[in-house]
Amino acid sequence: MSLWFLVFLSVLQGVTELFPVSSLGHTLLVPALFGMHIDKHAPQLLPFLVALHLGTALALLWYFRARWIALIGGFFAQLGGRKNDDGHLMWALIIGTIPTGIVGLLLEKRIERVFHDLRIVAIALIVNGVLLWLGDRIQRSRAHQAPEKMTFKQAFFVGLAQIGALIPGFSRSGLTMIAGNVAGLTAEKAAEFSFLLGTPIIFAAGVLELPKLFHARDQLADALLGGVLTAIAAYLSVRFLMRYFEGRGRLASFGVYCVIAGVFCLGWFMLHPQPV
């Protein structure tokens, strides 16, 4: 893997993992648009992807470090019988993580095999954009009805939405923000819950494959560089997005991008079919 391609993939992962535009979809579509071939069976690819996931997770942990300390403290306080908002939210995150954790372990590889056609990925990106636009409309219609505290039912509903992100073209952060909007959360609260909810999922995706990273010692330098670049890109992305949604930023903007990008990619790959 050339240095510039390594940098390109690392930054692409760090940005698109958190922006509601589908990191997996972009990782498949963008290189193909530029004629770059990614060998999924290359021995150096898996360790590299592991490092990228860990870099993203560490960036999220660092950005929300004070929040996580409060959540963990509240969780143990609640176990001791002292009810508190942080402990409640921690339980909500645990409940929201369960659906994707189970389905991901059972079906992720099968889903990836079915949706490796880039035209299908482009269609999924278009649908993702439409859903973002609809989610934005719903959130704005309920702007003054947001609950003070997320219920466990809402958390489970948002967690179910994460399952859709196993399909390339659908965004994990996008789907969970949409679900949060449908559940009645403000844009800012939906974004925060989405990023907090995604942290254990992204971290687990890296940790489960961590032994393979250490077995590929000759690839550690590339993997380490990729992880660091991804962490920087992810940190800057989450910082921007939280400020964006605090300032009444709209999901619809990302929805428009996804539809335009998806339509362009669909047309391109219809005219230039890729080997399946």
Curated annotation (Swiss-Prot):
Q: Which GO biological process categories is it annotated with? A: cell wall organization; peptidoglycan biosynthetic process; regulation of cell shape; response to antibiotic
Q: What does this protein do?
A: Catalyzes the dephosphorylation of undecaprenyl diphosphate (UPP). Confers resistance to bacitracin.
Note in the entry: Bacitracin is thought to be involved in the inhibition of peptidoglycan synthesis by sequestering undecaprenyl diphosphate, thereby reducing the pool of lipid carrier available.
Keywords of the record: Antibiotic resistance, Cell inner membrane, Cell membrane, Cell shape, Cell wall biogenesis/degradation, Hydrolase, Membrane, Peptidoglycan synthesis, Transmembrane, Transmembrane helix
Which InterPro entries does this chain map to? Answer: UppP
Is Transport one of the keywords UniProt gives this record? no
Documented EC number(s): 3.6.1.27
GO cellular component entries: plasma membrane
Membrane topology reported for the UniProt record: Multi-pass membrane protein
According to UniProt, the reaction catalysed is: di-trans,octa-cis-undecaprenyl diphosphate + H2O = di-trans,octa-cis-undecaprenyl phosphate + phosphate + H(+)
One GO term in the molecular function aspect is:
undecaprenyl-diphosphatase activity
| UniProt-recorded name of the protein | Undecaprenyl-diphosphatase 2
Family classification: Belongs to the UppP family.
Looking at the UniProt entry, the stretches that span the membrane are 1-21, 44-64, 87-107, 114-134, 150-170, 190-210, 222-242, 251-271
Coiled-coil intervals: none
Compartment(s): Cell inner membrane
